[in-house]
Design a protein with these regions (language model features):
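Solvent-exposed loop and edge beta-strand segments that line ligand/cofactor-binding
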Residues: 165-169
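Conserved amphipathic alpha-helical segments that form helical-bundle/coiled-coil interaction surfaces
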Residues: 99-162, 174-186, 191-201
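Short arginine-rich
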Residues: 201-211
Length: 221
């Protein structure tokens, strides 16, 4: 069935806002006002309401009676749970993927890692990091697991983005990525699983620290 123009518009608004939330262009707590968004995207309120409803359903926005819709905050506990989900699933994905990775797959991942090392814009770093991991996990042939990981990454995105602004974190990540590729090339599925688990857990600790710092800052203000 062909989508209506309103559905197409809603999808476009949703994808744009989702990307802006995931990359912290729209920070937690930022208001998502229907009038402003309708004017910005040149659409009626109908597709905007649909897009906002989808963001709320995805856990990316919060709708409060008489207060409108805003970008959702994550509690430290919610972040921990999402990180636990990620390391469990990503560890399993790489474990399943390693036996099926060809030299061409490794070469493609290496190319992405080379691009990542040269990237200077945080947006580009974020995108290439995602593509690097996704290129490896795809060989696991577990679309539902991958979908769950993508959902968790999306919900963490507004906080995942911040660690990439630190050169120390970028350098550490580069070392871990190169080690992961060596393990994949050697066919060491268990070693790769352990490396991915360590990588995700470390990132998770940074995110929880950021959330706690923001919470303290709000309390002080």
């Amino acid at each position: 069935m062909k989508e209506s123009s309103s559905q197409v518009a809603a999808g476009s608004v949703y994808e744009t806002l989702r990307s802006e939330i995931a990359t912290a262009v729209l920070e937690p707590g930022a208001p998502l006002k229907q009038d402003h968004l309708a004017a910005r995207f040149g659409v009626s309120h109908v597709p905007v309401r649909e897009a906002l409803s989808r963001l709320v359903a995805a856990g990316l926005a919060t709708a409060r009676l008489n207060k409108g819709t805003s970008v959702a905050f994550l509690s430290a506990r919610e972040a921990v749970e999402l990180i636990e989900l990620r390391w469990l699933l990503e560890g399993r994905l790489i474990e399943l993927a390693v036996p099926h990775l060809s030299r061409a797959d490794i070469a493609r991942a290496t190319g992405l890692l080379d691009e990542l090392g040269k990237a200077r814009q945080v947006e580009e770093v974020f995108r290439l990091n995602h593509e690097f991991h996704a290129s490896l996990y795809a060989k696991a042939d577990r679309p539902l697991l991958l979908q769950s990981v993508e959902s968790a990454r999306l919900n963490l995105g507004r906080y995942l983005y911040l660690p990439w602004k630190s050169k120390t974190n970028v350098d550490r990540s580069e070392v871990e990525h190169k080690k992961l590729l060596r393990l994949c090339l050697a066919g060491d599925a268990q070693g790769a699983k352990a490396m991915v688990t360590e990588h995700v857990i470390h990132t998770g600790k940074l995110i929880v620290e950021i959330i706690e710092q923001q919470k303290t800052s709000v309390a002080i203000d």
